[in-house]
Regions:
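A short, N-terminal "cap"/entry segment at the start of jelly-roll beta-barrel domains
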Residues: 1-69, 155-179
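Conserved short histidine dyad/triad with adjacent acidic residue
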Residues: 57, 72-88, 121-126
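Short histidine-centered beta-strand/loop micro-motifs
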Residues: 63-64, 82-88, 111, 130-133
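Intrinsically disordered, low-complexity regulatory regions enriched in Ser/Pro/Gly/Thr
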Residues: 69, 87, 95-97, 111-112, ...
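Hydrophobic/aromatic beta-strand elements that line small-molecule binding cavities or substrate pockets
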Residues: 73, 116, 129-131
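Short, conserved beta-strand element in jelly-roll/cupin
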Residues: 74-79, 87-103, 145-147
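Short acidic-glycine-tyrosine-enriched beta hairpin
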Residues: 107-126
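A short hydrophobic beta-strand segment most commonly corresponding to one strand
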Residues: 119-120, 129, 135-156
């Protein structure tokens, strides 16, 4: 290697690598969260909120930094009449805890009852869906699980098409306050 090429290589070797130390620090944070985060998330410690889709309680998700797991989300919905309607890339598993009803997925009607598992497939362009409670005297209740691992690769987005009839708030306010 000639002199100028060797000098350039030496300069490059002396350049400060800021990415690797950042990666190490982020991995340390993730490991610490896994070691010290909550293993049991208690329902009584998890508040109910009304959002554009339903009455919801978030057990864990990326924004909740006190849990041991950060690769998934788990949330419970209570649906009195029907949920809001929205579209996202799918990849959601919903276990029906109580009640009965149906879900419309891309225009197709699918009945369900307590003990059933609803699967929203991963689809290019997303999956439009809305959940309906069949019993006006008793709300339906279910637990949803979704993995975060693929989101960045799918260009994940959520498009709200219709709000729940129980939503009376301001979307902008709920984003600012988390309520």
């Amino acid at each position: 290697m000639k002199g100028s090429g060797r000098r350039r290589m030496n300069r490059e070797l002396r350049a400060k690598d800021t990415w690797y130390p950042r990666l190490i620090k982020d991995l340390e944070k993730m490991n610490q969260r896994a070691e010290t985060g909550k293993i049991v998330v208690r329902g009584k410690d998890t508040p109910w909120m009304q959002n554009r889709n339903a009455k919801v309680r978030y057990y864990f998700m990326p924004y909740k930094t006190d849990t041991a797991l950060q690769t998934m989300q788990a949330f419970e919905h209570v649906i009195h009449r029907h949920s809001g309607k929205h579209r996202h890339q799918g990849g959601l598993a919903i276990f029906v805890l109580e009640g009965e009803g149906y879900t419309v997925v891309d225009g197709k009607h699918h009945d369900w009852k307590a003990g059933d598992l609803i699967l929203l497939p991963i689809m290019p362009g997303g999956v439009s869906h809305q959940h309906f409670n069949a019993n006006p005297k008793k709300p339906a209740r279910w637990l949803a699980l979704i993995t975060n691992a693929y989101r960045a690769h799918l260009g994940y987005e959520i498009v709200q098409i219709e709000d729940s009839p129980d939503w009376k708030g301001s979307w902008e306010k709920s984003v600012r306050t988390g309520r």
